[in-house]
Structures are given as structure tokens and as C-alpha cells.
Amino acid sequence: MSRLTPVLFGAQLLIMGANAMAAQVSAYDENALRVESRQGNLQILRGIEGTVVARAGIFHPPRLANLVIQSDSAVAEAKIFERNYEPGQWIAALGIATLGAAIGASRIPDVNPVIQVSLYATSFGALGYGGNRLHSAYGALSKAIWWYNRDLKR
């Protein structure tokens, strides 16, 4: 009987260690974030099940910093995202509207060409600047989620 005790004790340790490892993996699997885009809306999902924890629609950014509060690096990137996302959308929308006005003005006879050129220049400038802000925002979103997932307990 005394020889069997260490074997049983070792087997129990192996089984308990495997259960602890499975619990850690499932904790990561349940809390990791990912991003999906559905019908023009950005969604931030948590875990394998894909629970939606934040949405970003047109002119409506998600509050990402609240989701990634556990990681300081993720919060810093989330603030960059929040600072650039909404202004980028508004400025790009202004550029699209100005482009429409420029095209409309070009169809009207006897319009001063300076007006047309000004509208086109303004629209391209706004589209470029807004697109750059959105590009920075999406890069920061990617980094924030990466930092958050990296710092999760495994």
C-alpha cells in the first residue's frame, strides 16, 4: 500500500495540473478581443462565443479605453483611436460633400473656375486628412486589442 501512495499522489497532481491549465486557457479564450465589420459597422467581440462588447457605426465611435482598462499600453492606444476615429469620419464626410458640390458646380455653365478649383482642392484635402486620421485610428485600434490580448492572463 505504501508504494501505491506516491503513484496515486503523482497521478492526482498531473490531473489537477491539467485542469488548472485548461482553466487558464479557457479564461484567455473567454476574454480575448477581436474586431469584425458587419454591414459597415465595426464590432468588437469578446471570446470564442463572439459576445458583442462595443459597436462603432457612422459617426459613433466605441469607448475602447473602457474595454482594455487592464492594460496600460492598450489604454494608451485606445485613446489614440478615440481621438482620431470620430474627427476622421466627420472630415472625410465633409470631403465627400464638398466633392459633390464641386461636381455640381462644374455642371453649371458660367461658374467662375476659381470656385470649382477651390471646391475640388478643399474636397481632396479633406478626404486626404480625414482618411489619414481614420488610418491612424484603425492602426491604434489594432494595437490596443493586441496589447490587451497580450496582457491577458493565460
Language-model regions: role of each:
Residues R34-I69, K79-A137:
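Hydrophobic alpha-helical membrane-anchor/signal-helix detector
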